[in-house]
């Protein structure tokens, strides 16, 4: 019930932020041009700042080495998810020009908006440490493989590797330098960066609300592949992944955290990446809508099953 309560609260916040975006578009305070300005601000500044400061504040060098298993499990998780989503794309006969985007919306979960409050409520002492360690690999994967997957593949142009060099990957590398070098961030600067980074989530949700307002969401509610993602990636896969980690000598807390993270709905940032790369951002937004609504039922159900399997 605790997870259900957290989920409903986060969904309520999700809806409020998006309604603000809808209202701003309806009243012509925002339009497609200004929405893209918000997207660039989040992608180029607030999100990289959030990645850097949350990682530096959440992990120290000793923790990085002592909890290295989280990093290894995260790598394994994304390898398996990449293979699974490729299989799902074949199973649901996704159009060739949409396969990569479908993989992106199915692979990357909404850790920042839903994962953090759920995991930290279950594990108040170490939850944020696990999330911070996970974020290192998660964001590195999003801003490298995720960039590749959200770049249209059917336009005849080869992928430009320079896209992998971006503010977010720079933030991750810089954070690792600070952690390994045990370099403290001065108090005032830390506070300023924390506040700048904190704008990422509400701005991303307001942006998403504006995108929803500019599209016909009914065109995407009936897409079977999104429900395939819900059933297979958000329900069956987390259970199998939880069982897969059982024989290994890792703590039950880490095992449960990683399995829960794999059950999360689509990450909101994927819409921004897709639109910035010229891909079908509305398709990504449709996935967010369907998977987020379904997660109200699937996440508590999966969590309950974890309790029986533990």
In which residue ranges do the predicted regions lie?
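Alpha-helical transmembrane segments of multi-pass small-molecule/ion transporters
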Residues: 1-310
């Amino acid at each position: 019930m605790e997870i259900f309560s957290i989920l409903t609260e986060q969904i309520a916040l999700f809806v409020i932020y998006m309604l603000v975006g809808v209202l701003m578009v309806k009243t012509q305070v925002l339009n497609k041009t200004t929405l893209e300005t918000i997207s660039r601000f989040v992608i180029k500044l607030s999100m990289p700042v959030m990645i850097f400061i949350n990682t530096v504040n959440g992990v120290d060098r000793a923790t990085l080495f002592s909890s290295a298993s989280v990093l290894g499990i995260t790598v394994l998780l994304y390898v398996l998810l990449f293979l699974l989503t490729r299989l799902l794309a074949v199973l649901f006969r996704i159009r060739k020009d949409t396969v990569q985007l479908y993989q992106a919306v199915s692979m990357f979960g909404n850790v920042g908006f839903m994962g953090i409050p759920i995991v930290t409520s279950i594990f108040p002492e170490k939850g944020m440490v696990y999330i911070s360690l996970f974020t290192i690999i998660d964001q590195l994967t999003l801003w490298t493989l995720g960039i590749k997957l959200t770049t249209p593949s059917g336009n005849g142009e080869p992928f430009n590797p320079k896209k992998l060099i971006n503010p977010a990957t720079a933030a991750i590398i810089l954070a690792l330098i600070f952690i390994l070098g045990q370099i403290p961030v001065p108090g005032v600067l830390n506070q300023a960066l924390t506040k700048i980074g904190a704008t990422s989530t509400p701005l991303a949700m307001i942006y998403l609300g504006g995108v929803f307002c500019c599209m016909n969401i009914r065109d995407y509610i009936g897409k079977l592949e999104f429900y395939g993602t819900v059933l297979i990636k958000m329900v069956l896969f987390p259970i199998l992944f939880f069982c897969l980690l059982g024989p290994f000598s890792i703590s039950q807390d880490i095992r449960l955290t990683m399995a829960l993270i794999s059950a999360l709905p689509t990450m909101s940032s994927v819409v921004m990446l897709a639109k910035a790369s010229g891909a079908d951002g509305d398709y990504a937004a449709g996935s967010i809508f369907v998977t987020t609504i379904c997660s109200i039922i699937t996440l508590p159900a999966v969590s309950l099953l974890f309790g029986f399997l533990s």
